Amino acid sequence: MYRSKKQSQILSYQELLKKQRRWFPIEQSLCPKDILDLLTTIKTSINKYTVATTATENPHIRRALHDQLDTAVYLHDELSDLLLEKGWLG
């Protein structure tokens, strides 16, 4: 059951990202430096979520932190793909 819920969350993130790109195209509104800064911020968040997830003992908090970690990793992947696609990172 968890995997199907997680898969549906990932699909909804993908749909949201597609809609966001259509309504607010990232490549037209931000320069490569802005996106690289965002990528660095997300990487820092991933590190902090990892530490917090392993440090907490409460399973509900751990689950919430893990979900946030998954979202941050997914967003990092999407932004990295965008940077590579545009040739801004290589």
From Swiss-Prot:
Entry keyword annotation includes Secreted: no
Location relative to the cell: Spore coat
Coiled coil (UniProt feature): none
InterPro entries with a match to the protein in the record: Spore_coat_CotF-like
Main location: other
Pfam families, per database record: Coat_F
Keywords tagged on the record: Sporulation
Gene Ontology process terms (BP): sporulation resulting in formation of a cellular spore
Family (UniProt): Belongs to the CotF family.
Protein name, as recorded: Spore coat protein F-like protein YgzC
Source organism: Bacillus subtilis (strain 168)
Lineage: Bacteria, Bacillati, Bacillota, Bacilli, Bacillales
